[in-house]
């Protein structure tokens, strides 16, 4: 799990990078700048 520096509600492939209100990325996603990356 990688800490995000901003609310990452950016969508990729039609799915949210992380749920609204969450402070950390989960589900194999991480936030990088304004991109959601699968790790």
From Swiss-Prot:
Record-level GO cellular component terms: extracellular region
The keyword RNA-binding belongs to this UniProt entry's keyword annotation: no
InterPro entries assigned: Hwtx-2-like
Cystine crosslinks: 4-25, 8-31, 17-36
Subcellular localization(s) per the UniProt record: Secreted
SUPFAM superfamilies in alphabetical order: omega toxin-like
Transmembrane is among the record's keywords: no
GO molecular function: toxin activity
Free-text tissue specificity from the UniProt record: Expressed by the venom gland.
Miscellaneous notes: The primary structure of the mature peptide is identical to that of Eurypelma spider toxin 2 from Aphonopelma californicum (AC P61510).
Family that this chain belongs to: Belongs to the neurotoxin 12 (Hwtx-2) family. 06 (TXP1) subfamily.
Function comment: Inhibits voltage-gated calcium channels (Cav) in rat cerebellar granule cells. Has insecticidal activity.
The protein's name in its UniProt record: Omega-theraphotoxin-Bs1b
Organism this protein belongs to: Brachypelma smithi
């Amino acid at each position: 799990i990688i800490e995000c520096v901003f609310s990452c509600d950016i969508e990729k492939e039609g799915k949210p990078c992380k749920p609204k209100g969450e402070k950390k990325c989960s589900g194999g996603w991480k936030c990088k700048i304004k991109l959601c990356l699968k790790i």
